[in-house]
Amino acid sequence: MAPGSWFSPLFIAVITLGLQWPKEAATFPAMPLSNLFANAVLRAQHLHLLAAETYKEFERTYIPEEQRHANKNSQSAFCYSETIPAPTGKDDAQQKSDMELLRFSLVLIQSWLTPVQYLSKVFTNNLVFGTSDRVYEKLKDLEEGIQALMRELEDRSSRGPPLLRSTYDKFDIHLRNEEALLKNYGLPSCFKKDLHKVETYLKVMKCRRFGESNCTI
């Protein structure tokens, strides 16, 4: 079977769900803080799921199994987001204030706004990255949601120093397809990792602020 000619039912379901994301849900009108958090968490969960399934399908389609372990341990696995002091897990996140976590989340989201528009140019399989425009829209929706939360919680007297804005723009989109594929192998992996961080931060904030007994992170 030719690479990219089949996809798992879960991946197809994720893409379908993404395309059906209602436009009216993309806005963040005035609403209770609990609803703002709930909406932001749902958007982050959806994007993380989409990123994880995209990475699986990309790896299954393009990367021979014997190369996967070596590639994951190479420089290609480095993520630019590692250059900012963002928490790496739930325990670390719980040591940060809500505003700090929102600022980290915003930087992570904004670091992807440009590169997601290039994904379909880097990788040849349009079924894997052909929805990059929709992913960009969802990132913008989540960015707006995080900014709305920051406006609600903002305490200007406790603002920290500006964060270094990481970038994924250095990934090369001008190489031949095979070369670009290997050079940029870490891109979908980093996207998945960064969205997982954002989802974790938002869940930590929502759980400790509203004390949900059934909260899972």
Swiss-Prot record:
Listed GO CC annotations: extracellular space
Keyword Secreted appears in the UniProt entry: yes
SUPFAM superfamilies: 4-helical cytokines (SSF47266)
Signal sequence coordinates: 1-26
Role summary: Growth hormone plays an important role in growth control.
Family according to the record: Belongs to the somatotropin/prolactin family.
Name of protein: Somatotropin
Species this chain originates from: Struthio camelus
Native organism taxonomy: Eukaryota, Metazoa, Chordata, Craniata, Vertebrata
